[in-house]
Amino acid sequence: MTVATKPEPDKAAVLAKAVLNAAGQLGLTQADLAGVIGVHRTAISRMKQAGTLDPASKSGELALLLVRMARALFTLTGGDADWIRHFMRTPNNQTGGVPAQQIQTIQGLMTVLRFVDAIRGKV
């Protein structure tokens, strides 16, 4: 008797799909996403077609942080897409700016992520 084993999912494919879903959930355009992960916006189109993003690359590491932020916001809001988009597009006194603009830099991404993690810790 042979046992069928499930092949291990391709980490690069999983990350590409996750970051594209996270960007959609956060209301980010392709250009916004490109700015966050540090690539040209045409690279996002190529990533969609190829379906891969190397988790070990700098872009991959930034994508993982963005996915973490999106998941935390999803948990906080119970999946309320309107609230998530409102949070991303309006000035926030606690983060010191508009989160969608702040996450265009690594420092801003970390600031917003720390804020969301801190709020999530209180819930």
Question: What is the meaning of each model-derived region?
Answer:
Residues 1-123:
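Non-transmembrane "mature" sequence context
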